[in-house]
Amino acid sequence: MSDFAFKLYEYNVWANQQIFNRLKELPKEIYHQEIQSVFPSISHVLSHVYLSDLGWIEVFSGKTLSDALALAEQLKEQTEAKEIEEMEDLFLRLSERYILFLQQKEQLNKPLQIQNPSSGIMKTTVSELLPHVVNHGTYHRGNITAMLRQAGYASAPTDYGLYLFMTKTEKA
Amino acid sequence: MSDFAFKLYEYNVWANQQIFNRLKELPKEIYHQEIQSVFPSISHVLSHVYLSDLGWIEVFSGKTLSDALALAEQLKEQTEAKEIEEMEDLFLRLSERYILFLQQKEQLNKPLQIQNPSSGIMKTTVSELLPHVVNHGTYHRGNITAMLRQAGYASAPTDYGLYLFMTKTEKA
């Protein structure tokens, strides 16, 4: 299971980069443009994804969920204000941190107890939760694509099936 | 890996039902309402997800990818015209077919060779591709949430993390 969770995370990095590459092709103002949607703008969506991913690796590294949520809240405003290139860099450095962490195989199946403020304690592992980080990213990439279309622009392909074809067909 | 893929699919069924439950609370016309987004309406998004999922289980059951794509094309118009309750029923029956198929453990790791019209042959297994079915569903649930907000309505929570908390905390 852990190898699969690691591979899914690598897909997540590829999919985020597809979105950044596409956003950098568009007029600069699109990134902060107000759009009536799930979030006020695409920068708000990417900040939310970044701060969630940051929160989870803090939890994986021993922080409590409430401390991780507090950290995210503290960084929210400054993260939302960033420009697309700065955001791309933040995502890149965070993915490097994840990859370093996930390469320590013993981390993947280390038992975790997560105290959720609203629903008690969950006993889990990093490899069980990592698919949530990826699934959460996919969900918000789905938001971003709809928001881009709403603003009149196409998005970028980010399907896991496409990623599998690209990575596996080359090796075939 | 296969148990995890099965569990991820069960999450997908739960997440789809969350969306159907929410859509059924809203004014009936929302389902077919034209919205400038990734698809012309929410019914088009759910039809696309349904026909993709149908296509994949046909491939898992031995059909070629091009035959499965042809089947989806054939059913497209009639699927898009369905009302929300009919769509919910289609999804339910398809998920029962998936669960029956996935309970045959030997199916999960059966070698598959998939001829993609545009990028050659991929050697894979059902359990390796199943996460694509789920990830694809999550992506389009992300579209639907943005489309609902665009139309002025909140969506429903469908996070994998929430699903894990709900299913694991009860058993703790």
Swiss-Prot record, chains A, B:
A divalent metal cation binds at residues 48, 136, 140. Belongs to the DinB family. GO terms for molecular function: metal ion binding. Homodimer. This is Protein DinB. Pfam families: DinB. The keyword Metal-binding applies. Keywords: Metal-binding. The keyword Glycosyltransferase does not apply. Gene3D superfamilies: dinb family like domain.
